[in-house]
UniProtKB/Swiss-Prot annotation:
It is found in: Secreted. Glycans are attached at residues 175, 202, 233, 361. The active site is at 142 (charge relay system), 218 (charge relay system), 537 (charge relay system). Residues 26-108 form a propeptide. GO terms for biological process: proteolysis. Its EC number is 3.4.21.-. This is Subtilisin-like protease SBT3.10. The keyword Glycoprotein applies. It holds the Pfam family Peptidase_S8. Its main location: secreted. Residues 29-106 form the Inhibitor I9 domain. It comes from the Eukaryota. Residues 390-464 form the PA domain.
């Protein structure tokens, strides 16, 4: 009977909903983008938004019910709940640039700074010269912050910069007057667009705090990686022990919570957070957020972070963003606009070897984050029935086959938690998983889960098959760091080329993003408020921390100058001089589509010698060069813009890289460099051409003095290939013996244009 009632009620609800849908059209959240604001008074901007909605909806009450956000600082626009027909009507108003549906974004996730050479050291170290980042303000758009973490204590801080116009909002378990301090100077949260799209947050289904407080720890981890205070004797399950700190321990942090557990990040909320951050006076914006391909063009307001970033950069605020976690597949990058600093993820010179000793006394070193007691010699098994040795199929085995034993399995694809769950449910004592390297280690305190590659896994399998009673001993993980551990681009890190504009190299730079130890909220799996996380989300704040230090030392540098300094001084080998590899289905030498300019080298970036600088006008010319229409460019700028005729070449955009996706015959391009090193300098060119490609630079020498700080040069590139090829890579370096200003060169020959080759 109860089932009948439930089904009847469900059926009636469907019928009623269908009937209502004929009467009331469904409202959705739309972003109405108006471009550059016409008033300096934010209240006047908001009033103009209300007037526009009033003309459409007919009453003040309807306007207040509809409007979600007013964007009134970095640009003009608003988010509102509208029906499809209302959105169409408002899009036809002459002052409206574009009306777009709301979009959703995802979050991407001790030793790091020493590995990169950013150590307190002596008075000549980068940290000391940059005064730890004091007086610089970084804005972090993420899941919020856990303010009680000691990483956010303000001991030794002076006053908050007088230019700061932001504040701290109170909310659930967050008191703005108590939880903010001279380090954590700002905390706001944005959920209106998320609520408008999905309904009011149901905390039973989606546990979170209606405040800037961080529930899952992602935002806390990011913020503490950028600027966490010094905290000694920190570890995770006993591993990675050392002094934890952020890259710029003296920076002021402003947190903007726009991402919510299980509901992601509403584009309209993120855009509002960016608008507020611009108004509040942040010096840098850090976004560990991603979308997935296919992407929208940079001039399309549906690419909300790109549009918001453009307005931030136009006001001198560098925007650092994650490359995405869809690797190792090519063309999977997000945040690809040329004005954004896009970050890939690498490992570092630290690993967690875990000794596996077989009954024949052979010891194999796997990788794990296992902090439990040593597992003495116990039974070892590999399920031999068809497919059941597959990690995804372990649950198909009888529990008796795994109970009381360590299980070996093979994973053909990225491993999931299914294998761990199956073994634990069967009463198994541990799991050895043979797989391609992904660097994603699941931390477990009392259950050994150890990863090995297929070769070592096969060795273990041969041992199992060679004896009637195979046994194994697994020791607790240890921490190993130093030159014996090489650097690799992480498997998950998204790869180029750029799917929107292939002549724009992405990613720009790489930084450690694997097993990064930082603060986290106590709601998550942690050890004393700290945890290891991996992702381009974790690499992004590493770069943001370096940008803070550069901004402290060079407050007059533009966002493009900072990007240039980082890209042109990057390591193309790891700090120990070993080649950097890129992990994937097979391991290969890393190239610019894996790591951009290379692995970030903070100490060198401070004194790059030369920079490839750009202004907002250069970005406008870029938009013209890739055939975006005058109308779409005008939408971004908020003012009428007419591209020159003929249009400029995208290859002439003054990037610290050269990427030619469709070379046929010969092409000539131009770059301009600005001297920021010794006044009287002479640089000579060194060319490492891509295979089968000729590169000639004119002039081959650049002379700078007190009256000449800028020099232009041309690059003539021609191919000797007679067929369509893949990309080949090289470099172009200007050197004065003190500085080596290197940019990557990526060239693909396309005899048949716009041709996709399956072979």
């Amino acid at each position: 009977m109860s089932k009948t009632i439930i089904l009847l009620a469900f059926f009636l609800s469907i019928v009623l909903n269908v009937q209502i849908s004929f009467v009331v059209a469904e409202s959705k959240v739309y972003v109405v983008y108006l471009g550059e604001k016409e008033h300096d008074n934010p209240e006047s901007v908001t009033e103009s938004h209300h007037q526009m909605l009033w003309s459409l909806l007919g009453s003040k009450e309807a306007v207040l019910d509809s409007i979600v956000y007013s964007y009134r600082h970095g640009f003009s626009g608003f988010a509102a709940k509208l029906t499809e027909s209302q959105a169409q009507q408002i899009s036809e108003l002459p002052e409206v640039v574009q009306v777009i549906p709301n979009t959703l974004y995802e979050m991407t996730t001790t030793r790091t700074w020493d590995y990169l050479g950013v150590s307190p050291g002596n008075s000549d170290s980068l940290l000391q010269k940059a005064n730890m980042g004091y007086n610089v303000i970084v804005g972090v758009i993420d899941t919020g912050v856990w303010p009680e973490s000691e990483m956010f204590n303000d001991k030794g801080y002076g006053p908050i910069p007088s230019r700061w116009k932001g504040g701290c909002e109170s909310g659930e378990l967050f008191n703005g007057s108590i939880h903010c301090n001279r380090k954590l100077i700002g905390a706001k949260y944005f959920i209106d667009a998320n609520n408008a799209q999905f309904g009011v947050l149901n905390k039973t289904e989606n546990p979170d705090y209606l405040s800037p407080r961080d529930f899952n720890g992602h935002g806390t981890h990011v913020a503490s990686t950028i600027g966490g205070s010094f905290l000694p004797n920190v570890s995770y399950l006993g591993l990675g022990r050392g002094t934890a700190r952020g890259g710029a321990p003296g920076v002021h942090i402003a947190v903007y919570k726009a991402c919510w557990v299980q509901r992601g990040c509403s584009g309209a909320d993120v855009l509002k957070a960016m608008d507020e951050a611009i108004h509040d006076g942040v010096d840098i914006l850090s976004l560990s957020l991603q979308t997935s391909v296919p992407l929208f063009p940079e001039t399309d307001a549906r690419e909300l972070t790109s549009v918001g970033a453009f307005h931030a950069v136009a006001k001198g605020i560098p925007v650092v963003a994650a490359a995405s976690n869809a690797g190792p597949t090519a063309q999977t990058l997000s945040n690809v606009a040329p004005w954004v600093l896009t970050v890939a993820a690498t490992t570092q010179d630290r690993s967690f070897p875990t000794a596996i000793t077989l009954g024949n006394n052979i010891t194999i070193l796997g990788q794990a984050i296992f902090g439990g007691s040593e597992l003495g010699f116990v039974g070892l098994t590999y399920p031999e029935s068809p497919l059941s040795g597959d990690c995804e199929k372990l649950s198909a085995n009888p529990k008796s086959a795994m109970e009381g034993k360590v299980v070996l399995c093979f994973a053909a694809s990225t491993p999931s938690n299914a294998a761990i769950t199956a073994v634990i449910n069967a009463g198994g004592l541990g799991l050895i998983m043979a797989r391609n390297p992904t660097h994603l280690l699941r931390p477990l305190r009392n259950f050994p889960y150890v990863s090995v590659d297929f070769e070592l896994g096969t060795d273990i399998l041969f041992y199992i098959r060679s004896t009637r009673s195979p046994i194994v001993n697994i020791q607790a993980s240890r921490t190993l760091f130093g030159q014996s551990v090489s650097t690799k681009v992480a498997t998950f890190s998204s790869r180029g080329p750029n799917s929107v504009s292939p002549a724009i190299l992405k990613p720009d730079i790489a930084a450690p993003g694997v097993n990064i130890l930082a603060a986290i909220s106590p709601n998550s799996i942690n050890d004393g408020g700290f945890a290891m996380m991996s992702g381009t989300s974790m690499a992004t704040p590493v770069v943001s921390g370096v940008v803070v230090l550069l901004k402290s030392l060079h407050p007059d540098w533009s966002p493009s100058a900072i990007k240039s300094a980082i890209v042109t001084t990057a390591w193309r080998t790891d700090p120990s001089g070993e080649p950097i590899f890129a992990d994937g289905s097979s391991r290969k030498l890393a190239d610019p589509f894996d790591y951009g300019g290379g692995l970030i080298n903070p100490e060198k970036a401070v004194k790059p010698g030369l920079i490839y600088d750009m202004t907002t006008d250069d970005y406008v010319m870029y938009m013209c060069s890739v055939d975006y229409s005058d109308i779409s460019i005008s939408r971004v700028l908020g003012k009428i813009t007419v591209c020159p005729n003929p249009k400029p070449s995208v290859l002439d955009l003054n990037l610290p890289s050269i990427t030619i996706p469709n070379l046929r015959g010969e092409v000539t391009l131009t770059r301009t460099v600005t001297n920021v090193g010794p006044v009287n300098s002479v640089y000579k060119v060194v060319i490492d051409p891509p295979t089968g490609v000729n590169v000639a630079v004119t002039p081959t020498e650049l002379v700078f003095d007190s009256t000449t700080t800028k020099r232009s040069f041309t690059v003539r590139v021609s191919t000797t290939h007679k067929v369509n090829t893949g990309y080949y890579f090289g470099s172009l370096t200007w050197t004065d013996t003190l500085h080596n200003v290197a940019i990557p060169v990526s060239v693909r020959t396309q005899i048949l244009q716009r041709y996709y080759d399956e072979n």
